[in-house]
UniProtKB/Swiss-Prot annotation:
Top-level taxon: Bacteria
A single GO BP: putrescine biosynthetic process from arginine, via agmatine
Family annotation (Pfam families): Arginase
The protein, known as: Uncharacterized protein TM_1158.1
Length: 240
């Protein structure tokens, strides 16, 4: 079986040294766009929607300040689904604009979103159709019910300290265990953010290893897919 569609949105050069990851991608957008970090200015919305891939897959968003771009991806889903978010923070503030702190609140207004399951957060607030869970695969599967799932992973949920934010409490092993338990047939797509600060270049290699581990647990192991030598050598993907 073929691997999933892998897309990289590299707005600040954060994936420049992640050569193996880039070699697995079918599409890499590498260009700085003003007015989208932390929040999306209304006039930037058409530009963002234009660069997003037309089909779902696995999208790498950069650092956590771009997590709100998940909203534009899941807005394309036209069937009932559950959103599962792995995040050290609850990005559900009441704000006028779409920001990295408010995107879940905005997403709850989407027609086809049934519920949100937030895993690993240290912030909990009673919000209609938002559920909380630790890394318990059976509880998470029960919350999914019969619906397909879209997964959004901010690596600041992990306890290994590779992001530009404070570390969470979830071990990489526990995160991967949850991902392995979600049947491939239920996964609509996923995105991953939480890259290191660009100045902390010594964290880049470890961050790439985590990205590859997540891809493996989500898809490669289930598909019995082994990347070829061209990927292991880090040959470049198509870059825009």
């Amino acid at each position: 079986m073929i691997p999933p569609h892998i897309h990289i949105l590299d707005f600040n050069g954060i994936y420049e040294e992640q050569r193996i990851l880039k070699s697995l991608a079918e599409f890499v957008f590498s260009k700085k766009i003003e007015g989208i970090r932390y929040m999306v200015l209304p006039e930037k919305i058409p530009e963002i929607e234009n660069i997003l891939p037309s089909h779902l897959g696995v999208t790498f968003l950069g650092d956590g300040e771009f997590h709100h771009l998940t909203y534009f991806i899941i807005k394309k889903i036209k069937r009932p689904f559950v959103l599962v978010v792995f995040d050290n923070h609850l990005d559900a503030r009441e704000e006028e604009f779409l920001t990295c702190d408010s995107w879940i609140r905005k997403a709850l207004k989407l027609k086809h979103l049934v519920k949100v399951v937030v895993v690993g957060t240290q912030e909990q607030e009673k919000i209609h159709r938002v559920f909380y869970s630790e890394t318990d695969p059976q509880k998470i599967l029960k919350l999914l019910g019969r619906h397909p799932v879209y997964l959004s992973i901010d690596k600041d949920v992990l306890d290994i300290g590779i992001t530009g934010w404070e570390s969470g409490r979830v071990s990489l092993e526990d995160l991967l265990n949850v991902l392995r338990h979600i049947p491939l047939r239920k996964i609509l797509g996923a995105d991953i953010c939480g890259e290191p600060d660009p100045l902390e270049f010594w964290k880049m290699q470890e961050s790439e290893k985590v990205n590859l581990s997540i891809l493996s647990a989500l898809f490669f192991e289930k598909l019995h897919y082994v990347p070829g030598s061209e990927h292991l050598e880090g040959k470049p993907a198509h870059v825009t």
